[in-house]
Design a protein with these regions (language model features):
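Surface-exposed, low-hydrophobicity beta-strand/loop segments enriched in small/polar/acidic residues
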Residues: 1-104
Length: 104
């Protein structure tokens, strides 16, 4: 039996970054994107999901199946400066919102 198992990795604890965190709004901690389960102020210890399908704000002409990144909590095209890879859209963008698969 493996003795080095830590967890399933589906959730991770993190410290809320500058500006805090809002439940359901993607947060990038270096290259790790998390979806916070609850909100908190800068410095608060929180828990976020590392995968799953999420409905979040989006910007640009994004289409289902397209790779997307996240910048300041909003899905953007992968080539957007200072963005972090998020995953792939599972819906077209409608009214600046899209459903996307968070792929670690």
């Amino acid at each position: 039996m493996a003795k080095n198992f830590v967890s399933s990795g589906e959730t991770q604890e993190f410290i809320a970054p500058a500006g805090g965190a809002v439940a359901g709004v993607p947060v990038a901690i270096n290259d790790l994107v998390l979806i916070p389960l609850s909100g908190g102020l800068e410095g608060d210890k929180l828990v976020g999901h590392t995968r799953g399908e999420w409905r979040v704000k989006a910007d640009g002409a994004l289409k289902k199946g397209q790779k997307v990144s996240v910048k300041a909590g909003v899905l953007v095209a992968p080539a957007t400066a200072d963005s972090v890879p998020f995953g792939k859209l599972s819906s077209d963008m409608v009214s600046n919102v899209a459903t996307a698969l968070l792929i670690p």
